[in-house]
Amino acid sequence: GKFVLYTDWSIDAVSAILHQEIDGVEHVIEYSSKTCNRHERNYCPTEGELLAIIYGLAKYRSYLLGQIFTIVTDHSAL
């Protein structure tokens, strides 16, 4: 089924949650997060949210490569 990658950034951490849609219902495949280093803590919101997307794509590359998927973020500019 189709994959959905949810990402988020805060000053302290980035997170990524991978879901897979099966029969119209999303099921969590894996959760992941990491703390931000001192440079990442200085990012503006757009840079931070993009960092979270890149983190999620790298973390779940093996699941997503060659698949149709959607990225969901709470930052409207992205």
Language model feature labels by segment:
Residues 22-51, 75-78:
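A short, polar/acidic, helix/strand-boundary loop motif
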Residues 1-9:
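Two-metal-ion RNase H-like nuclease active-site motif
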Residues 8-12, 74:
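A short acidic Gly-Thr/Ser loop motif
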